[in-house]
Amino acid sequence: MSLKRSIAGCVASLTLAVASYATPANSMPPSPAGMHTLRANGDHFELDGNPFQILSGAIHYSRVPRAYWRDRLRKARAMGLNTVETYVFWNLHETSPGQFDFSGQNDVAEFVREAQQEGLFVILRPGPYVCAEWDFGGYPAWLLRDPNMEVRTSNPAFIAAASRWLHRLGQELAPLQSGNGGPIIAVQVENEYGSFGSDHKYMEQIHHLLLDSGFNRAMLYTADGADELPNGSLPELPAVINFGSGDAKAEFAKLDKLRPRGPRMCGEYWDGWFDHWGEKHHTTDPDEEAKELEWMLAQGYSVNLYMFHGGTSFGWMNGANIDAGKYGPDVTSYDYDVPVSENGELRRKYFLLRDVIQKQTGITPPAPPAPMPAKALAPIEFKASTPIWDSLPRPVASQQILSMEDLGQNYGYILYRTNIAHAQSGELRINELHSYAQIYLDGIFAGALDRRLDQSSLSVQIQHDNTRLDILVENSGRVNFGHQFSHERAGITREVTLANQPLINWQIYPLPMDNLNSLDYKARLCTGACFYHASFKVDQPADTFIDGRSLGKGEVFVNGRALGRFWNIGPQRTLYLPGPWLKTGENEIVIFDMNGKPDPTVPMISNAILDERSN
């Protein structure tokens, strides 16, 4: 046994104990203040040598406006939770190689400190892969600029990038581990790796990277589905399992066989589910979940609710899935039908689970914070717009097609332009479209292709020589789960052909839409792919929802912040606009709509619409 492995085993035994017994009735829960040691002891966890049952809920700092972190944490404490869990999203913090951002909304250390101040321990899941229905599973898109990159493997280039990231993250969060007086009692190694592969050498590399990055004063552990646990776990670390509502007894029975001496914990209890564009809105039965949670707690098992509060995948950060070969991009809302809604309202599910926790622990939690209901604000009147064609940046000339990543672009849109020399008819084929394209001939819309529908070609009539071909492509979200990672470059990633002949000599326009200040609006409303601009007054900022039922497909920006995507196929038809992102007085909104039409009014309403699909 190597010295490093020996040290790792000692660290695991020191830091991975969480007892599976509830806090004694009518006692106070342990405080996260001071130094603590969490360890696994047989089938339960212990905190400082005393049995400790983890009652956790997931809240992702990046999906909640910073001004609301404390409100959501207080609501977790008021439900009876003693712990919160969060992923850390690499792509938010290292937006280009070696350039890190932990400020403002990205100040994850402040989120952890606020959790401690509110009486909560923290489970940290730093990945580097996180899944989470998040673009590229949290990996930064710039990794894919390397044509030989193989993420989530022992590929030297990937390990070097992951090492730099985790070491920098350690500077932020290692001091906040429970062994150092912080609230972080546990740190997850990778994330459900057993669903991806079985390379234990790779898992050991990530384990040791975390230790070397300073994550050695909290319990390290792994998490997988029970069936995948042998592939994704490490023998020296505790292993927890993830499953959805209705599966608890069967999944824990599997864990009993796989790890008869290990702690009993559900690392992700899916008390809701996420949505894809064009598919149904998911809900789960709160009464059945309350019964199942009561059973788990009565057994002394520890639980992390995934999610407690889902929030919003603001901007471009929604992920996607590949299921049986079908691409499914996630909606902007991460409401998840969980105890606390997208805008922070407490659902019936919240109070049912709260009652269960109080009954099982004997502890009366504090009262929830006062509600902050969303409000309807005055409708926004649009009077100015500009077509995207009037606002193109300097193009990149290329003989062949280039992806977004080839051009150093991470998110947004990209325009491919070339000339067709001779009039002809035939099939226009886009090989490897990622993810949605509109095709224009001499500025006239000719059709759209959607990866979601497995569309890659359409018949076109080129009626004139020297016809301009424009292909406007949206990156609808990179796949975040499965074996698709190394193929998730955005834009067009292979050739475009017309009548089986490759098209060349492209002018390529990156359109990240990260700065819209230079747009030149005219006092009219255009149609097609357009930017629409308006100013609107707010007397008292409050949460509200932008009603997108009159819009087509695109993105909304308010006061320079990208709120997220809208699409008239549903099921999501509103976009959450947090009150703290509004100003008293004048505010600015920009809507980019690929299918724009001159409808001058967009309402702002008091409720989310998450379950309305087009016919």
List PLM regions with ranges.
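N-terminal carbohydrate-binding accessory modules
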Residues: A25-T83, R113
